[in-house]
Amino acid sequence: MAQASADVLIPLLWERLSPEHWPVRLTQLPEGTALVGGAIRDALLNQLSDQPDLDFIVPSNAIALAKSLSKQLGGTAVVLDAERDIARLVLNNWTIDLARQDGQTIEQDLLRRDYGVNAIALGLRPWGELWDPTGGLSDLRDGRLRAVSEGNLVDDPLRLLRGPRLISEHPLELEAKTQQWIALHRKRLGQAAPERILSELQRLVRGPQADAAIACLKTLDLLHGWAAGEP
């Protein structure tokens, strides 16, 4: 991805994301809604699927919004995290996650995410603002996978495994400092739920760069402690 300004990237994202084909209309979302995460990353890499998973940040009441949309549109709403106000809406084979903004601003929310390439947001209501407080656009351009911070990896140990999984799916290489952090905290992976670990591994082995990702797992010795049942 060549270096480009927001004036170029925003129309490009809009064209590739094609929100007019989403099962939820933008007018059904509250003011302050932004799209974040994998759909943004994949659109910028031109690897977007026909029905990408959509992750929306909303100012408040995400669970209530998911339930309301499910009643209006005939989908199914599932509460993922009541304390953090996160829900999932499954609708016409689309998966839409809605989460209350974590922090006072969208920038603060993005600074708490796992990797820079996942910490990019596009404003939907109002439309037209692109947030990239961690340098994720540069990471995508340079083919680099970089953790936002060491603390963010430890906050949810599954993020340690998510790095190699992202390598399996995208043309990215782990940045050196991020490799050090993952290796340092590798035994913490056992704190994640086994079903979440299994889901990441299943996606990893199906990725087009699975060989590179498996080599990364071996280099980092990431699964040894988990597979051996070490604390």
Describe every region a protein language model picked out.
Residues 1-231:
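Catalytic cores of the polymerase beta-like nucleotidyltransferase superfamily
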